Amino acid sequence: MRGAFYIAIALLIVRSRTATGNAKSDVSRPYVVATGGESTKATPKRYLRGGLALSATNEERMDATVLSKDAKALATEGEDWLRLSLGPVGHSQTPQLKRKFDSLSAIDESSPSKKLATPDRAFTRRFRAEDPQLPKYSKIHQTFLNIPHMPHKISLTEAVLMYRMVNWKNGSSPTKQKSAEALLRLVERTSADDLERALGPTSVRLASQKKIRDEYFKNLTTMYARVHAFCHANPAECTNESTHSPLERKMKAPPDIVLFPLFNR
């Protein structure tokens, strides 16, 4: 009896596999599961999904992943990219997926000396001695320190920013939005120590952060207005010698010709 039982089980397994092989379908097409059919009548039954009698073949069909054409293309590109990453490539055509990935990776590799930095770190860095323009910046700083009626003693960072702004080709006027945005970026990136130096320790301790930065922005606006007026009155002191600089153009402009009347009335 035991031998006959094992033989029956083996026959059932063989017939189940045969039916599975005959009933293979293209999984790339949407599939509607049927609870029975000529190819599944003799296959083992399992009671699944709310008590419906489903064959083992149909269960495998239901568990199969249905891939769309876009998913197939993406999988193919992924396999190509893995082959390129893990081993030598037999073709010269780079898959689209690898090209996209490499273009993203190459953004930072093109300049390995540049490191990612927070806005604070980028804007509060000090001008080091190896900077070739440091002597020029120091001279400009000393010039701006002599401008009267400044709200506070201008720092090297503030002086360099305003020196660059006053030489802009367009938008260098203190009333322009471009100038206001540049000063606002400086306010947002100024450290607490620099705010205390500019406004004084008492003002910083008693006021809120918003009031502190608003006050600092007001000071910068006043300072730049005076720097702008000074530089346009003395363009030789502030020009960066660029042909686009309004100060340089002002220096090289021909003098105004004064026409005297021929006859006195």
UniProtKB/Swiss-Prot annotation:
Substitution effect: residue 170 to A: Does not affect host cell death-inducing activity
Protein's name in the database: Secreted RxLR effector protein 16
Keywords: Glycoprotein, Host nucleus, Secreted, Signal, Virulence
Motif RxLR-dEER, residue numbers: 46-61
UniProt source species: Plasmopara viticola
Cellular component, GO, one term: host cell nucleus
Signal sequence coordinates: 1-19
Family: Belongs to the RxLR effector family.
Subcellular location: Secreted; Host nucleus
Triggers of expression: Expression is up-regulated at the earlier infection stages.
Biological classification of the source: Eukaryota, Sar, Stramenopiles, Oomycota, Peronosporales
Role played: Effector that acts as an elicitor that induces cell death and promotes ROS accumulation in Nicotian benthamiana. RxLR16-triggered cell death is dependent on SGT1, HSP90 and RAR1, but independent of the somatic embryogenesis receptor-like kinase SERK3/BAK1, indicating that it acts independently of the detection of cell surface pattern recognition receptors. Enhances the expressional levels of defense-associated genes involved in the salicylic acid-, jasmonate acid-, and ethylene-mediated signal transduction, resulting in disease resistance.
Free-text comment on this protein's domains from its UniProt entry: The RxLR-dEER motif acts to carry the protein into the host cell cytoplasm through binding to cell surface phosphatidylinositol-3-phosphate.
